[in-house]
């Protein structure tokens, strides 16, 4: 790695979207759905040069004839054959690079099982022949992207939400909390409450439409009860949305009822604490001396934190839970949808990081377990 010309590759594999690009860039070059599709019926499309699998956007666009699978569930890789296909697609089709010529920085979910990071390491070195690689925890990268080394990150994506307290660059594993409530659940809930309004969304194709409605029209209310009253008494909160077939639907209190379930998981029939309480519980599991730093550096990250109004609501809810004299600051960077990737891009291009890479040589000498010694 003495040659500075070679840019490292940064790949953030999320449950919903894969973000990939080159270290030193300020945004990922490729963002595509983390899905692998296989034809439902063998040989239906004779002579069409049918492939046995499709990845990402191509799988999405052909979803009518495919069975779609997400190899990453709740942030953790569960299907390695499909994961390998996603990485192959990332390197060869999206970035158009030879992975054996670039160091690769991968990201992992907090509390990722040890066997998983070993498997990632093994695939990078043995299947893709990477010269060097590193595995970084997603939330830690988001914190770096915000220019901090101490703080608590609320990272909420498509498949899972975590609260991760970080002190001087190290995640504190005993205080990390996981909440299996994220973007995909909100989309499902919006499908359900729109059905109650008389609009039917059931297929996977229609689910994508609902996801778009969620991303474009939903917001978090500062005071849920007040907002419900406003919605009931006037049409000021109503918005219309045009479906692909030209039909126009109107959406009212669903706009804020959907993301409200982040704060009240009981809406989804879940008996867990909301994101505000989970953040607070996570802080309370930390040493009393660092709590002040965590309250003052609460960083939001991931696509599910993109709802307008979420930062103000978090501020209000955490202020209500915390000691009255505590200074609370919620940091919601505008680029937080990609902050894990951006943090990876920053880390992999630091001169001080270059000695941290696991080289192919070290891997050959020690095997996959090297990852636990070099990446923590």
Curated annotation (Swiss-Prot):
Q: What is its EC number?
A: 3.6.4.-
What's in the keyword line of the UniProt record?
A: Acetylation, ATP-binding, Cytoplasm, Cytoskeleton, Hydrolase, Muscle protein, Nucleotide-binding
One term under GO cellular component? cytoskeleton
What the entry lists under PROSITE patterns is as follows: ACTINS_1, ACTINS_2, ACTINS_ACT_LIKE
User: Where in the cell?
Assistant: Cytoplasm, Cytoskeleton
Q: What class of enzyme is it?
A: hydrolase
GO MF terms held by the record? ATP binding; hydrolase activity
Q: Where this protein primarily resides, as one coarse class?
A: cytoplasm
Residue(s) carrying N-acetylaspartate? 3
Q: What residue ranges constitute the propeptide?
A: 1-2
Reactions catalysed, semicolon-separated, are: ATP + H2O = ADP + phosphate + H(+)
Job of this protein? Actins are highly conserved proteins that are involved in various types of cell motility and are ubiquitously expressed in all eukaryotic cells.
Q: What else is known?
A: There are at least 12 actin genes in P.magellanicus. Only one actin gene is expressed in the adductor muscle.
Q: What family, per the record?
A: Belongs to the actin family.
Q: What is this protein called?
A: Actin, adductor muscle
State the organism named in the record.
Answer: Placopecten magellanicus
Specify the taxonomic lineage: Eukaryota, Metazoa, Spiralia, Lophotrochozoa, Mollusca
């Amino acid at each position: 790695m003495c040659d500075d010309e070679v840019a490292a590759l940064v790949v953030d594999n999320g449950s919903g979207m894969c973000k990939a690009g080159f270290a030193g860039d300020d945004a990922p070059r490729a963002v595509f759905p983390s899905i692998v599709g296989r034809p439902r019926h063998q040989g239906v499309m004779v002579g069409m040069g049918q492939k046995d699998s499709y990845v990402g956007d191509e799988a999405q666009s052909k979803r009518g004839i495919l069975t779609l699978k997400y190899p990453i569930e709740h942030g953790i890789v569960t299907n390695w054959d499909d994961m390998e296909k996603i990485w192959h697609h990332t390197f060869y089709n999206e970035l158009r690079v030879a992975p054996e010529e670039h160091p690769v920085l991968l990201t992992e979910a907090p509390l990722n099982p040890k066997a998983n990071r070993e498997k990632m390491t093994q695939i990078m070195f043995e299947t893709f022949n990477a010269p060097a690689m590193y595995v970084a925890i997603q939330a830690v990268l988001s914190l770096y992207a915000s220019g901090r080394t101490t703080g608590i990150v609320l990272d909420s994506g498509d498949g899972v939400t975590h609260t991760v307290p970080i002190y001087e660059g190290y995640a504190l594993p005993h205080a990390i909390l996981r909440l299996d409530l994220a973007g995909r659940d909100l989309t499902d809930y919006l499908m359900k409450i729109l059905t109650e309004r008389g609009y039917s969304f059931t297929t996977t194709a229609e689910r994508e439409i609902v996801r778009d409605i969620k991303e474009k029209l939903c917001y978090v209310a500062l005071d849920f009860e007040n907002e419900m009253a406003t919605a009931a008494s006037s049409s000021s909160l109503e918005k219309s949305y045009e479906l692909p077939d030209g039909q126009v639907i109107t959406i009212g209190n669903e706009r804020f009822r959907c993301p409200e379930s982040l704060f009240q998981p009981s809406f989804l029939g879940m008996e867990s604490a909301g994101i505000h309480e989970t953040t607070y519980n996570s802080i309370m599991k930390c040493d009393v001396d660092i709590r002040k730093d965590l309250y003052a550096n609460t960083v939001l990250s991931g696509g599910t934190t993109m709802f307008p109004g979420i930062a103000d609501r978090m501020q209000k809810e955490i202020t209500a839970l915390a000691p009255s004299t505590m200074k609370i600051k919620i940091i919601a960077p505008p680029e937080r949808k990609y902050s894990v990737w951006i943090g990876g891009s920053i880390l992999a291009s630091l001169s001080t990081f270059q000695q941290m890479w696991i080289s192919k040589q070290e891997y050959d000498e020690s095997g996959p377990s090297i990852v636990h010694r070099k990446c923590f």
